[in-house]
C-alpha cells in the first residue's frame, strides 16, 4: 500500500535528518522564534467557507501536477487572492516537496502556514516549528492513539496547531478520544487513493459541533464548494484543482462564487 511505503521511507528519512540536525540544535532555533500565526482562527468566523490553498507539485497517484512549479510565486498568488491559510507539501520522495519551500514561503507572507507531511516522529514537530510552520498535519492512519495524544501535546507546548486527519469512522472515534480540535476529513483513501466527497457527508454527523471541520481532497468545482457549505463544514483544503488551473486567481473566484449569499 502507498501509505505503508511512504511511512517506511519517512522513518529512514527522519533518521538521516536527526543526524544532520540534532534535536538539541532545533530546540535552540525555536527558542526565540516569533509566536505562531493563528491557524485555528483562520478557519472560523467566515461568511463563506475558509480556504486552505495548497502548494503541491506532485502526488503518488497523479504524478507531476504542476510542471512550471514555483512555490513562492504560487504562495504570492494565494496571498493576493486572500486565502485563509496555505498548506505546503514538504514530503520529498512521493510528493516532490521540500522543507525549503516552507522556509521560503514563510519569509514572504503573513498567512498561517500548514506543513503537509507524514509525521511519524516527535522530532518532526519541533522541526516543523523551526521551518516556519504554524500548524502540522497528523494523519490518523499513520499513528497510534498514544502517538496522536503525544504529538498534539508537543505541538501545543511549542505553540503550533494540529490538523488531525481521518478517513473513516474508526479513525474519527480514535482521534475524538485524543481531544483533537481541528479535524480534517480526507475524501481520498490513503491506502487506495480513491476519492469521493461522500466521505465528508458520511463522517460529519459523528463530529461534535464544537469541533472545526476541514474537508480535504477531491474538491474541484463551485458546485462542490456549495455542497460542502450546505453540509456545514468550516473550511476546505484544496491543492490539485488550483495547481492545474491556468489562473489561480480566476479559479479561486469561481470556487467562491455565490457562497456568501
Swiss-Prot record:
Question: Could you say which EC number(s) this protein's record lists?
Answer: 4.1.1.48
Biological process according to GO: L-tryptophan biosynthetic process
CDD domains per UniProt: IGPS
User: Where exactly are the transmembrane stretches of this chain?
Assistant: none
EC main class here is lyase
Respond yes or no to whether keyword Amino-acid biosynthesis is given for this record.
yes
InterPro entries according to UniProt: Aldolase_TIM (IPR013785), Indole-3-glycerol_P_synth (IPR045186), Indole-3-glycerol_P_synth_dom (IPR013798), Indole-3-GlycerolPSynthase_CS (IPR001468), RibuloseP-bd_barrel (IPR011060)
Question: What does it catalyze?
Answer: 1-(2-carboxyphenylamino)-1-deoxy-D-ribulose 5-phosphate + H(+) = (1S,2R)-1-C-(indol-3-yl)glycerol 3-phosphate + CO2 + H2O
Q: What keywords would UniProt list here? A: Amino-acid biosynthesis, Aromatic amino acid biosynthesis, Decarboxylase, Lyase, Tryptophan biosynthesis
Keyword match Lyase: yes
For this chain, the annotated S-S bridges are none
Protein's pathway:
Amino-acid biosynthesis; L-tryptophan biosynthesis; L-tryptophan from chorismate: step 4/5
Task: Write out the GO MF terms.
Answer: indole-3-glycerol-phosphate synthase activity; phosphoribosylanthranilate isomerase activity
Query: Which family does the record assign?
Result: Belongs to the TrpC family.
User: Under which name does UniProt file this protein?
Assistant: Indole-3-glycerol phosphate synthase
Origin species, per record, is: Alkaliphilus metalliredigens (strain QYMF)
